[in-house]
């Protein structure tokens, strides 16, 4: 089997940037996805350019912060900010202009490309793929990238994806044992499994803007541990990135 440890939320805070960098340089993370509207976007771009082996994707969002474009009336609240989570977006989906969705996601992609980075894959913040999949599919074809294989989406066409997407390494599931269970479920197969991760060093920015905070430093510890790397080697698990699909 092969595993992609993808680090979501690149750029959400300086601590997240450096936590992901640590998990790449000393650990098993080879891919990360960048929030184009994030507070530490410029720092993330700088770090990405200094570490060209780190595979960069776009962490497309309609549920974090503010959009890059103005005038998106069906995607924002009275303060001009996105809805705060999947449920809020889903509940208002009937009123959402999908043209606005496509324009905003395109702007996010173009901002990352315009910063001089190459994108290999797309995923979404708060796993909103099922709500916007036709547009994500269209943009993935347009830009020639891979996408995350969300369980609630079945028709990927010619777009490359991992075979499976594992979300168990999150919150109370952040443990070495969780990764071992994932490996044991697929060992001896040709499956390519993406494991979602959110490593970060905790800082005030992260505390102010994210509800998922404390487990992130534990993720860094596990993803950089010699124990994990030795285990993956013993099980002959190949750690790859989205570039390798």
Swiss-Prot record:
Instruction: Name the InterPro entries for this protein.
Output: COD_ChbG_bac (IPR022948), Glyco_hydro/deAcase_b/a-brl (IPR011330), YdjC-like (IPR006879)
Recall the GO molecular function terms of this protein's record: deacetylase activity; hydrolase activity, acting on carbon-nitrogen (but not peptide) bonds, in linear amides; metal ion binding
Q: Which GO terms describe its biological process?
A: polysaccharide catabolic process
Which UniProt keywords are given for this protein, alphabetically ordered?
Answer: Carbohydrate metabolism, Hydrolase, Magnesium, Metal-binding
Q: Where does Mg(2+) bind?
A: 59, 125
Q: Does the keyword Ligase apply?
A: no
Cofactor(s) needed for function: Mg(2+)
| The protein's name | Carbohydrate deacetylase
What's the stated role of this polypeptide?
A: Probably catalyzes the deacetylation of acetylated carbohydrates an important step in the degradation of oligosaccharides.
Q: What is the lineage of its organism?
A: Bacteria, Bacillati, Bacillota, Bacilli, Bacillales
The UniProt entry, under PANTHER family, shows: CARBOHYDRATE DEACETYLASE, YDJC DEACETYLASE FAMILY MEMBER
């Amino acid at each position: 089997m092969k595993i992609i440890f993808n680090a979501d939320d690149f750029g959400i805070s300086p601590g997240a940037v450096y936590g992901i960098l640590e998990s790449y340089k000393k650990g098993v993370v080879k891919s990360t996805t960048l929030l184009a509207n994030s507070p530490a976007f410029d720092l993330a771009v700088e770090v990405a350019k200094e570490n060209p082996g780190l595979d960069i994707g776009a962490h497309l969002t309609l549920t974090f912060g503010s959009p890059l474009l103005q005038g998106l009336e069906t995607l924002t609240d009275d303060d001009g900010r996105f809805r705060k989570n999947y449920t809020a977006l889903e509940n208002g989906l009937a009123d959402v202009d999908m043209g606005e969705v496509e324009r905003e996601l395109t702007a996010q992609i173009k901002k990352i490309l315009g910063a001089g980075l190459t994108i290999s894959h797309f995923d979404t913040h708060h796993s909103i793929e099922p709500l916007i999949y036709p547009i994500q599919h269209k943009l993935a074809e347009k830009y020639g990238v891979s996408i995350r294989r969300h369980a609630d989406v079945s028709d990927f066409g010619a777009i490359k994806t991992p075979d499976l997407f594992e979300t168990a390494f999150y919150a109370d599931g952040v443990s070495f044992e969780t990764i071992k269970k994932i490996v044991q479920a697929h060992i001896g197969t040709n499956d390519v499994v993406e494991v979602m991760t959110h490593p970060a060093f905790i800082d005030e920015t992260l505390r102010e803007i994210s509800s998922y905070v404390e487990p992130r430093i534990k993720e860094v510890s596990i993803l950089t541990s010699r124990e994990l790397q030795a285990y993956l080697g013993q099980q002959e698990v190949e750690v790859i990135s989205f570039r390798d699909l």
